[in-house]
């Protein structure tokens, strides 16, 4: 790779495509975790480039909590159909039977049962030995220290003190029976890189990333967009229309919007240049307990 002639975005693109191809060649049953967000959209775009003009040699897996934004579900189904991807959707049946609800049971229990346990169930059900994820090192401190090849034991647990060295572009993919890896092709990308690449490559994204007037409720310092009627208003709470957008997407009761007028990709990029906060500041699950994200990853989270 001629690093002198390549822009930094093309270098990142080449690195990610190399990682995706390595995993496809090295593992017998890989899968791409598809959470419908901007990083998943970029990762899917890179995977399609990696195997063009052929189709993806692995399926997409969406671990559904039942609480995503309606626009996310519509985008997911439309994207899978447009690109001819095999889409697997899994919900934790035990969580559904228990009626797990982020309002009633809290973000920690909701995430553990519907996301972490749901993911482990799906990986065991289909026997996947490698799972692509869209996490980036600039998002959060526990992700900053995680390798591109993130090894998980037979219980899908991550041990941050027992990670393999990654020298240059050499990755050690040897695993024992029952073990697996999570692979993060976007590890070295930043939020700014993601948005510039989306603009450069004209990648389709969920409209929630663009500012619009939306019904919003302010609760616990978070701007919560009301997506359906599964919420009980507390005394004094009022739903108002405000110009907001999302920097990150998840379950609608646990994902805060930000006030913004950025309605185009160039406006989002310009907004990011002066932003001083993390994109995940609006994710309740990142701060529902001390060391929240690392604890979740140790237990098998994405």
Swiss-Prot record:
Which pathway does it serve?
Answer: Sulfur metabolism; hydrogen sulfide biosynthesis; sulfite from sulfate: step 1/3
Keywords in UniProt for this one? ATP-binding, Nucleotide-binding, Nucleotidyltransferase, Transferase
Q: Name one Pfam family in it.
A: PAPS_reduct
**Domain of life, per lineage:** Bacteria
What this protein catalyses is: sulfate + ATP + H(+) = adenosine 5'-phosphosulfate + diphosphate
Molecular functions per Gene Ontology: ATP binding; sulfate adenylyltransferase (ATP) activity
* Gene3D superfamilies per the UniProt record, alphabetical: HUPs
Report the InterPro entries cross-referenced here.
PAPS_reduct_dom, Rossmann-like_a/b/a_fold, SO4_adenylTrfase_ssu, Sulfate_adenylyltrnsfr_sub2
Q: What is its EC number?
A: 2.7.7.4
BP GO annotations: hydrogen sulfide biosynthetic process; sulfate assimilation
Q: Tell me its family.
A: Belongs to the PAPS reductase family. CysD subfamily.
Q: Which PANTHER family match?
A: SULFATE ADENYLYLTRANSFERASE SUBUNIT 2
Protein task: With CysN forms the ATP sulfurylase (ATPS) that catalyzes the adenylation of sulfate producing adenosine 5'-phosphosulfate (APS) and diphosphate, the first enzymatic step in sulfur assimilation pathway. APS synthesis involves the formation of a high-energy phosphoric-sulfuric acid anhydride bond driven by GTP hydrolysis by CysN coupled to ATP hydrolysis by CysD.
User: What is the protein's quaternary organization?
Assistant: Heterodimer composed of CysD, the smaller subunit, and CysN.
Q: What is this protein called?
A: Sulfate adenylyltransferase subunit 2
Q: Which organism is it from?
A: Escherichia coli O157:H7
